[in-house]
Amino acid sequence: MIFLGYAVTLGYVFFLIFALGPMVQKHANTETSRKLIHTGLFLVWVLIDVFFKDTVHQIIIPVIFIVLNALSYKYDLYKSVERDTGNHKGTIYFAVAITAVMGAAYFVHELYYPSGIAAFCLTFGDGAAALIGYNTSTRKLRDGKSVSGFLGCIASSALSLLVFRAVYPVSVSVPAVLIVAVSAAVLELVGAGLDNFSVTFGSFFLSWLLINYESHAMLIGMGTALVIFFVVFFSGSIDYYGALLSMVMVFCFYYFGGTFGLLYLLSTFFTIFFVAVVRKRLRPELKKEKSRRFIQVLINGGLGCLFVVLYGLSGELRCLVISIVAIGGCFVDSLSSDVGVLSRAKPYDPLKRRHVESGISGGMSRLGTAAALIGSALIGLCTALALRLTAAEGLLVFALVFLQTLVDTVLGSAVQVKFSCPVCGCVTEKKEHCGKPAAYLSGVRFIDNNWVNALSSIIITAAALLIFKNR
C-alpha cells in the first residue's frame, strides 16, 4: 500500500510537471502553466489522506518536493514551473509550507484536517489569484496583486473549502468557511513568494481555531475585523501590514472586550477617519499624509490591545479601564494634531515659549487643545457610564487621556530630534528636505515622532496601572 501510494503520488506530480505543464506552456504562457500545476497539487493532500494518513510518510512526501524544487530552482530543471523573468524561490516555499503543516498534523492529530484546509487554500486560492490576476487587467493592490486576483482567490478558496467540508468530517459552519477564504485572500497579498507561507499558516491556524472553538462572538469578531481591513487598506489610510495589525486588534477588542470594547475602538478610528476627510476638504492645500504604517498602528493600539486581552482572560475591570486609557490617550493626541492643523494661527510651544511652524512637534494650538479636551471628556463620561465607574474614576480617566497630549507635547519639544533645511532654512523633523540632507538642529538624534508617541503612551499607561491597581 505504501509503495503504491508513492507510485501514484509521484507519478501524478510528474504528470503535472512533465506532461500537463509543457502542453499548457506551449499554448498559453509560463505563468499559466506554473499556476495550473500549483492548483493541481491539491490532489497530493488527497492522495496523502488515502495512502499515508497518520504515518511519517505524510511528511516524507512534501520533503521530497522540497529537494526536487530546490534542484529545479538551482539548475532550472522544470521549465513549466520556473518563471520567464528569472528563478524565484516560491516553489520551494510552497513545499516547505506544506511540509510544516503536515509535520504538525503528524504530531498533533487534531491538526490533520486544518492541514488539508491550508493545502486547499494554498493550491486553489493562491493559484486562482495568480491565474486570474495575470490574465486580467484591473487595479493593482500591492506587489503586482490585482483586485480581480484578490476576488478570484476568495471565490476559489470558498468553493474548494465548501467541497472539503462536504467530503471530510470537519465541523465548521458556512460563515466560518467564508471567513477562512477571505482571510486567505488577504494573506495572499503578502506577495514575493512569501504568500506561500502566509496563506498556508494563516488558513491552518484559523481553521484549527474555528473547528475547535467556533462561536458567534468569534465569527462576529473575525467578520468585523475583515471589514475594517477592507476599509483601512483600500482607503489608503493604513498600509498593508498596518491594516493586518488593525484587523487583529479589532478582533481582540471584540472577543476579549465585548461590544463596548469594539464600539470604543471603532468610534476612535472612525472619528480620526472623519476628521481626516474634513481636513482634506477644508484645507486642500495641506500636504497629503502618507498611509499609517505598522509601527504607528502598534504604538497607538498595542498597549490597549494587550490590556483588553488581559481583561478577557482575567475578568479584572481595571484591565479594561487601562486599555481604554491607553487607546484613548493615543486617539486624543492624534485628534489634537489633526484638528490643530486646521487652525490658521501658528502653534505655541509652551516649553520654549515661542510660536513654531504647524506640524512641528512640541507646538499646541487652541483648536487642537479644545478638541483634545472634548475628546477626553467624552471618553471619561462614556467609560464611567458604560462600566459604572464612580465620578472620581471617570474624572481620572478624563485626566489621564488628556494628559497624554501634554506629555507628548513636552517630549516633542524637549527630546525629539529636529533638523534645519540648508535650502529653505525651515525647521523640519525629516532627515532630508528640499531634496538635500538636513542639518541636525536639536533633540536626541534617535528619538523621532514614533519614539515620542511610544514613550508618552507608556508613561500614561503606567500611570493608569498605578492609579487603578486596586480597582
Predicted features and spans:
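Hydrophobic alpha-helical transmembrane segments
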Residues: M1-K79, T91-S336, G340-R471
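Viral RNA-dependent RNA polymerase
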Residues: K79-N87
